[in-house]
Design a protein with these regions (language model features):
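Short aromatic-acidic-glycine turn motif
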Residues: 68-78, 165-177
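Short acidic/proline- and small/hydrophobic-mixed sequence motifs that coincide with surface turns
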Residues: 58-61, 76, 109, 156-159, ...
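Secretory targeting signatures
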Residues: 1-28, 220-274
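Asparagine-centered strand-capping/turn motif at beta-strand->loop junctions
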Residues: 51-56, 149-154
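Terminal connector regions
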Residues: 85, 100-142, 176, 199-222
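Short, solvent-exposed loop/turn segments enriched in Ser/Thr/Gly
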Residues: 42-48, 141-146
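Hydrophobic beta-strand segments
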Residues: 63-66, 81, 161-164, 179
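Intrinsically disordered, low-complexity Pro/Gly/Ser/Thr-rich segments with frequent PxxP/GP/PP motifs
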Residues: 76-105, 174-203
Length: 274
């Protein structure tokens, strides 16, 4: 009974944490960073990068529009895209990929400018973790990431997606990709697998590190700053309960390594061909 009470307290902390630190005065701001351009094997032009939430409120509907120009200064096209995450917490960065899918236009691009639009949104519950991530390269030179997403929320997680932002040696973004867990719905206190691929050696060979973020209709990834607080809260609650039940000879274990999950996986990969 007491153990269930502790677990309930921890779950409530996770749910209300986004609201505990809401600022008194809202600052709505964001910036584009770490962008690079490339032309893929199909002849399509891309600009990939991140949008960093530099304000103190959540953002949504984050749209990046590009103005493409030829060498003579004439305008070619106005492609646009949204970040792969629908909701962005303060201090977080979300990847984007703006693509020009007309080969003739792509070949004529000499310069570009980017415009950023966004709106304030309400906080989203932190409840999802990507973990046990394994990286391999297939026979085509593609990077293949496999792992699991854990649902630590208070209800099922629908339309669960994993967003990968991949960086080169200079720290700039070289690829952004997205996949869904299989299946996309994760029941309460359960996990589902995912697989995310960086296709082809032309992009994969540039990758030196990456980050993974998870989002669903109900939840988003547990951020790094919150994880230590959760662990501290769990440890404190367990210590109190352990003291109270010590007279009857019962103790409660500390959280396992599996429970100490973090939002972001950001490593230098070491690949083994499959």
């Amino acid at each position: 009974m007491k153990k269930n009470t502790v677990l309930l307290i921890v779950a409530l902390f996770v749910i209300i944490a986004p609201w505990l630190f809401r600022p008194a005065f809202a600052t709505i701001n964001a910036q584009i960073q770490k962008e690079t351009t490339y032309v893929d094997l199909n002849g399509d032009w891309h600009v990939v990068g991140e949008v960093l939430n530099t304000g103190n409120v959540w953002l949504t509907q984050i749209r990046i529009s590009a103005t493409l120009r030829a060498q003579n200064g004439s305008t070619i096209d106005f492609p646009a895209a949204y970040t792969f995450l629908n909701n962005l917490s303060p201090g977080e960065a979300a990847g984007f990929n703006v693509m020009e899918d007309n080969a003739a236009n792509s070949g004529a691009v000499s310069s570009y400018t980017l415009n950023l639009e966004f709106h304030e949104s309400q906080p989203v519950t932190f409840a999802l973790n990507a973990y046990a991530v394994n990286a391999t390269k297939d026979i085509y030179g593609s990077i293949v990431l496999t792992g699991f997403v854990q649902n630590n929320g208070n209800t099922e997680s629908d339309y669960t997606k994993v967003v990968g932002t991949f960086y080169g040696a200079d720290g700039n973004v070289v690829y952004v990709g997205m996949t869904s867990t299989d299946p996309a719905t994760i029941p309460l206190a359960n996990r589902q697998p995912f697989q995310l691929t960086v296709p082809g050696a032309d992009r994969s060979n540039l990758v030196t590190s990456w980050s993974l973020l998870v989002e669903s209709q109900q939840f988003t990834s547990i951020p790094e700053w919150q994880t230590p607080a959760i662990i501290a809260g769990i440890t404190l609650c367990l210590a109190v309960v352990t003291l109270r039940v010590a007279t009857v000879g019962r103790t409660l274990p500390l959280p396992s390594a599996a429970s100490r999950l973090v939002r972001r996986v950001n490593v230098t990969p070491s690949f083994e061909p499959t």
